[in-house]
């Protein structure tokens, strides 16, 4: 028997060495991915105990045969006493395979008690059974006891929940049920004592919770979610959805103007007892609000600020219809405005010099030039700060017969004709033509004052040819000359 054990151990060593050499040879020929797989297989083999491999090689028998069972028991019973009283060769085998010797010495099998050999055989690996974790009845009972809420705590939670619902719904109605000073923050003593409708709701809540017994943990979370929503004074319909806080918080952070809110747009956010007609009425009332969908005051202030920063022409185009000029355009120099006023009122003055002004101030006279027939000229030697020279333009005057039907317009065609007549007329030819074209009712015109005449007929002297300016004026001051 000693020789048999020695031969068996040597054969096992040879087979293990051959298998290792074969695996090394295969790994040399395999790809890196397959080598990783082989390493994983090796790690799995190392986790198993060595005696399983030895027992697999030693006990090569069919599981269903009774003869193999008898042979296995005989071999194990014969090997066990021999290992205790063996020579030095057996000690060498025990040193080489300590797991095998230990399992053979200490393992005591209950062969006659088992129905099948496969359940109690030491050769079977037990790694697959580790994956299956069966819960015993005691563990299940303890878990149920932990999950199950006691009657007192359950009634208390349901009572709190119904009380909060009551307070929130009645706060929505603005009824004097809740005290104005405390609001929603009441003491715990007042929560326990409920009125008759509160008790009815508690009974209904208990009946619903008995139907849905699996949602007991969710009900506790619902009370906390209602508490968090009641802090802001709002009741959101997010029961059973703990992750909806991010979606429901931003609706009531702030409004631009009092208009439509989600509470009125979405019927789910309204109280449960409100009818559809009331919801429709509230929505129509909000639609009739004049401030519906209007920008907020900060937005309006920002718009006006951007409008004021625009240049004059663009701002005027945007303000079309309001006729409101910005303050910057009215900042024309007072001396320039006085000179323009004197030039317009004085019929003898045709050109004048403005004080030194920059380009921005000279550009402010450009809109006035078509209105008063002015040419704004600047000295080219000093472009940055040069005096502006305003001269009156020559315009052709065509005297038409005045309309006898409208007496009020007898003084106005003179000025209008001076701007609209296309044919140029020399002023020397114009002077003798004026007394010849007197209307029949000239007495009315003669009755006017001298100042009125000067203002009524400025184009006759205001628009002069540039050649006449150089030649000078030799006419008497009584005539309409320079």
Swiss-Prot record:
The modification Phosphothreonine is found at residue 91. The keyword Phosphoprotein applies. The modification Phosphoserine is found at residues 31, 86, 88. Residues 195-222, 408-482 are annotated as: Disordered. Keywords: Phosphoprotein. The keyword Transmembrane helix does not apply. Residues 414-427 have a biased composition (Low complexity). Residues 468-482 have a biased composition (Polar residues). This is G patch domain-containing protein 2-like.
